Amino acid sequence: MLPDALPRQLERAPQQVPFLPKEQPEFRLRGGWKGTAELLRADFEEKIQVVHKKDLKNRADYARITTLYTGLVLRARQPGDRFRPAGRGLSKPLRKWMNEAGVPNELRDTLPLLASGSEILWVCGEGFADGLAPDTESRWILHLDAEIETQEEKTNEYAR
């Protein structure tokens, strides 16, 4: 009975969830995605450090996001969505960006996104949109991450 009940339970995962990192740091979305939203205190030091771009792509200035955007939700793509990839300075349809970025077809309809209306602020695996990176003025940094649960994780979660 467990294997049959588990997929039905996961299909009932919401299509979108309100973005509330302080109250609800973990989220689940359809397609078996499980993620975390973490607020980190920004402690920039005066010394120079070598930082890899991949270490920063899932981090953004939390105050900038909450000041500029309202109605934040975590969800999958919808018609009319637009994304401004970091460093490119232009906005393009999310559908076109996914084609250019080589996002596998089977992930496109379930890939977690942080959105404000049709503007996409974060794409799982790509990072935050242009202009949201933390800087020396940032006090709080938002770190977002998500992955598809393994069957073992799903079974363990169900058994709890």
PLM regions and their residue ranges:
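AMP-forming adenylation/ATP pyrophosphatase catalytic core
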Residues: 1-160
